[in-house]
Amino acid sequence: GEGGLWSADGWTWNRGAVRPGRGAAPDVLTLGDRYLVAYSTTGGGLGGTHKGTVVTMWNKTLDPNSPDFKYTEPVVVAESADDEDCDAIDAGLLLDPTTGRLWCSYGTYFGFIRLVELDPKTGKRMEGNEALNVAIDCEATDLLYRNGWYYLLGTHGTCCDGVNSTYNIV
């Protein structure tokens, strides 16, 4: 569809979310009084292309009915080419509570999961930051910090097949 659901509290869901740039698989962080949104566009793997892009952009609100609702121009933070061993999709964001550093994981089961550092003030990739391969054979990763430990969660299996889906969290 053209949009989706949005929630201010993670429990109450509202219809009418705007999907900027027709992107997919977004992740959102609140940084100060703004929201940093990361999403991806892709050519699709599985016989298609591995050409993908992860972008970030800012908004003051996630409520599409607010007069303050306006995304900034998207900034590319990761890309993948047709013959690459990673598909730049499925961004996951983490603001490290111990250091204030901002991280973005991305990738799909067609190759590696990669990690890059972003500037928490701009949402841009830190200059000179090389992508680090951190996992393989999973997708839709997210990063968590709990009680002194860092976790990389991902999904493994097949999706989008109703009751025949085998997706599980690893």
Protein language model annotation of sequence segments:
Residues 1-170:
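Carbohydrate-active catalytic/glycan-binding domains of CAZyme proteins
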